[in-house]
Amino acid sequence: MENLIEEILKQIGEDPNREGLVKTPNRVKKAYDFLTSGYKADINQLVNGAIFEENTTGMVLVRDIEMYSLCEHHLLPFYGRAHVAYIPNKKIIGISKIPRIVDVFARRLQVQERLTDQIAQAIQETLDPLGVGVVIKAKHLCMMMRGVEKQNSELFTSSLLGLFKTDPTTRSEFLDLIRTGSH
């Protein structure tokens, strides 16, 4: 990958041997390795048995999970917050695992719509809950830095499964909870 980054530098008219750019190909490689580390992650290994029998029936919500990803169309970042909730079906998951699941899918080349669905589906497959709700609000640098150059636009996406999709009361509770004091 480093040779390719060096070639990009040459193609845009830069000197890859210039003092400030000598280590850039290696730095970019390391950055992309980290930013795309979700391809190498395994959800079952990540959860690592942190699923517990519990008879609770109330909604479980982790709100305002900071996330960032790379737009697959321009390789530019998008960033924002994810809100992830589920209704337990005799099982709960360690709460730190939910942001980790968000990171697994965010650390891939993405579109926000698919990212939202993948997070919801992973929670559904891992826990078999009565329902899952995921909402992501993000700013896309591909819209801010190029193209339409809209600095204040935000994209909202949602994925609703089970009770979140079929039961208006569950859906309303979820949306009310993420609105209250949300960033």
Swiss-Prot record:
Signal peptide: none annotated. Keywords: GTP-binding, Hydrolase, Metal-binding, Nucleotide-binding, One-carbon metabolism, Zinc. GO terms for biological process: one-carbon metabolic process; tetrahydrobiopterin biosynthetic process; tetrahydrofolate biosynthetic process. Its EC number is 3.5.4.16. It comes from the Bacteria. The keyword Nucleotidyltransferase does not apply. Zn(2+) binds at residues 71, 74, 142. The keyword tRNA-binding does not apply. One of its GO terms (molecular function) is GTP cyclohydrolase I activity. Pathway: Cofactor biosynthesis; 7,8-dihydroneopterin triphosphate biosynthesis; 7,8-dihydroneopterin triphosphate from GTP: step 1/1. GO terms for cellular component: cytoplasm. It catalyses: GTP + H2O = 7,8-dihydroneopterin 3'-triphosphate + formate + H(+). InterPro entries: GTP-CH-I_C/QueF, GTP-CH-I_N, GTP_CycHdrlase_I, GTP_CycHdrlase_I_CS, GTP_CycHdrlase_I_dom. Homomer. PANTHER family: GTP CYCLOHYDROLASE 1, GTP CYCLOHYDROLASE I. Belongs to the GTP cyclohydrolase I family. This is GTP cyclohydrolase 1. The gene is folE.
